[in-house]
Amino acid sequence: MYQTTTLKDKIKLFIIILLPILITQVSINLMSFFDTMMSGQFSARDLAGVAIGSSLWVPILTGINGIVLSITPIIAHLIGAKNKKDIPQVIQQGIYLSFVLSIIIIVIGGIALDPILQAMSLEKEVQRIAKYYLITLGTGIVPLFLFHTIRSFMDGLGQTRSSMIIILISLPINAVLNYILIFGKFGIPAFGGIGAGIATSLTYWIISGISIFMIHRVYPFHSYKVFQKILPPTLSYWADQLKIGLPIGLAIFFETSIFSAVTLLMSEYNTNTIAAHQAAMNFASLLYMLPLSVGMALTIAVGFEVGAKRLHDAKRYTYLGIMGGLFIAIFAGIILYTFDDVVARLYNSNPEVIELTKQFIIFAIFYQLADAIGAPIQGALRGYKDVNMTLVIALISYWIIGLPTGYLLANYTALEPFGYWVGIIVGLSTGAIALLARLLFIQKKSV
C-alpha cells in the first residue's frame, strides 16, 4: 500500500490490490466447485452427500477464517502507522490461535457429527458419503488455517499477488486429485464424493507448505523475520485478535450458516431437489467471491488510510469499492441468467435435476445482488475496526428475519423449497440496508 492523491490513482491501486484477491478467492472456491461438480457427475447421491457435508463444513470454515482474517486490518494499521517491529509477534500469536481453534473444531466435530447426520431425513448412502467426506476433509483443517493466517499477513502488507500465486499453483493439483480419487484412476479405487474430501485435504497441506516456504525465502516477507525468534503464546495478543476477529467470524458464520440451515431443512425433500439446490447454491457461492473479494480489498485500503489518519481517503475507497462490487454483480447476474442451462448441466445429467437447478438459479441471481452491497460494506467496516454492530446486524437479518421468512414461505405457500431462497434474499437485503446505515454513522462519527 502507498498513499494516493487522485481518484485515478485510487482506482489503479484498488484494482492492483483487488485482482489478486479476486483470483485467490475464486480459486479457493473452485475447490468446492470441483468437489461438487465432479461428485455430481459420479452420481446424484454423491452430489447430495457432498452437499450435506459442505453445508456443515462451510460455516465452520468461513467463521474461523473470519477470526483469522482479523490479522489483515491489524497488519494494515501497523504498516499505515509505520510500526513494523510488532508484526512478527502478531503473526506468531495468530498461528498459535489458529492451531488451538483447529483442535477445538476437530474435537467438537468428532463428538457431534454422527448425531447431527442421524437427526436428518437422509438416505443411508447419502448419510455415509456426507460423514466420510467430512472426516477426510477434517484431516486438512490444521494446515488450512495455518495458510489463512500467513495469507492474512501477506494481504495486510498489500502483497495480495503472493497468496494468489499459491492458490493458482494448487488449483490444478486439486482438480487432478479429485479426478483420480472420485472416479478411480491409475489403479486407485473410485471413492466418489468421499474422494473429493481426500483430495481437498491433501491440497490444504500443499498450500500450507508453500506459504511457509514463501515467508522464509521470498521478498518482502523474509525481511520481517517472522520466525527468527520463536515467541511463547501470549494470551493478551490472542485477546486482541479475538476482540476484532470473533465478531467478524461470528458475523460471517451467521451469514453462511443460514445457507447451511436451508440445505439441512431441505433434507425432507427428495435427493434430486437436494442435489439441484446444492448445484445452484454452489455456483452462486462462486459468484459471491466477487463482492467478497471487493470487501477484502476494502479492508486493506480503508485500514491503511485509517491507520494513517487519512479519513477522507478511506471514505473515497469505500464508495469506490461499493460501486465496483455492485457493477460486477449486475454483470454476473446477466451471465447467469443467459447461461442457466449450461451451468445446470455442469453438475448433473439427470433431466429433473437440471430443470430444478435452473429454477433455483433465478433466485440465486437476486441473492447475489443483495450480497454485492453487503459484502463490500462489511469489508470497509472491518477497515475501520468496527465489527461488533456487524455481528448484531448479521444475527438479526439472517436468523431472526431471513430464515423464519423462508421457513414460512416453504411450508405454508406454493413456493415449497424455493421459499427458503426468498427468505435468504429478504435476510441479505435487510442486512445490506442496515450495514449501509452503520457505515454512514461510522464515517460521520470519524470526521
Curated annotation (Swiss-Prot):
<feature type="transmembrane region" description="Helical">
    <location>
        <begin position="161"/>
        <end position="183"/>
    </location>
</feature>
<keyword id="KW-0050">Antiport</keyword>
<feature type="transmembrane region" description="Helical">
    <location>
        <begin position="420"/>
        <end position="442"/>
    </location>
</feature>
<feature type="transmembrane region" description="Helical">
    <location>
        <begin position="286"/>
        <end position="308"/>
    </location>
</feature>
<keyword id="KW-1003">Cell membrane</keyword>
<comment type="similarity">
    <text>Belongs to the multi antimicrobial extrusion (MATE) (TC 2.A.66.1) family.</text>
</comment>
<feature type="transmembrane region" description="Helical">
    <location>
        <begin position="193"/>
        <end position="215"/>
    </location>
</feature>
<feature type="transmembrane region" description="Helical">
    <location>
        <begin position="388"/>
        <end position="410"/>
    </location>
</feature>
<feature type="transmembrane region" description="Helical">
    <location>
        <begin position="132"/>
        <end position="154"/>
    </location>
</feature>
<keyword id="KW-0472">Membrane</keyword>
<keyword id="KW-0812">Transmembrane</keyword>
<dbReference type="InterPro" id="IPR048279">
    <property type="entry name" value="MdtK-like"/>
</dbReference>
<feature type="transmembrane region" description="Helical">
    <location>
        <begin position="53"/>
        <end position="75"/>
    </location>
</feature>
<dbReference type="GO" id="GO:0005886">
    <property type="term" value="C:plasma membrane"/>
</dbReference>
<feature type="transmembrane region" description="Helical">
    <location>
        <begin position="359"/>
        <end position="381"/>
    </location>
</feature>
<feature type="transmembrane region" description="Helical">
    <location>
        <begin position="244"/>
        <end position="266"/>
    </location>
</feature>
<comment type="function">
    <text>Multidrug efflux pump.</text>
</comment>
<keyword id="KW-0813">Transport</keyword>
<keyword id="KW-0406">Ion transport</keyword>
<dbReference type="InterPro" id="IPR050222">
    <property type="entry name" value="MATE_MdtK"/>
</dbReference>
<feature type="transmembrane region" description="Helical">
    <location>
        <begin position="317"/>
        <end position="339"/>
    </location>
</feature>
<feature type="transmembrane region" description="Helical">
    <location>
        <begin position="11"/>
        <end position="33"/>
    </location>
</feature>
<protein>
    <recommendedName>
        <fullName>Probable multidrug resistance protein NorM</fullName>
    </recommendedName>
</protein>
<feature type="transmembrane region" description="Helical">
    <location>
        <begin position="95"/>
        <end position="117"/>
    </location>
</feature>
<dbReference type="GO" id="GO:0006811">
    <property type="term" value="P:monoatomic ion transport"/>
</dbReference>
<dbReference type="GO" id="GO:0015297">
    <property type="term" value="F:antiporter activity"/>
</dbReference>
<keyword id="KW-1133">Transmembrane helix</keyword>
<dbReference type="GO" id="GO:0042910">
    <property type="term" value="F:xenobiotic transmembrane transporter activity"/>
</dbReference>
<dbReference type="Pfam" id="PF01554">
    <property type="entry name" value="MatE"/>
</dbReference>
<dbReference type="InterPro" id="IPR002528">
    <property type="entry name" value="MATE_fam"/>
</dbReference>
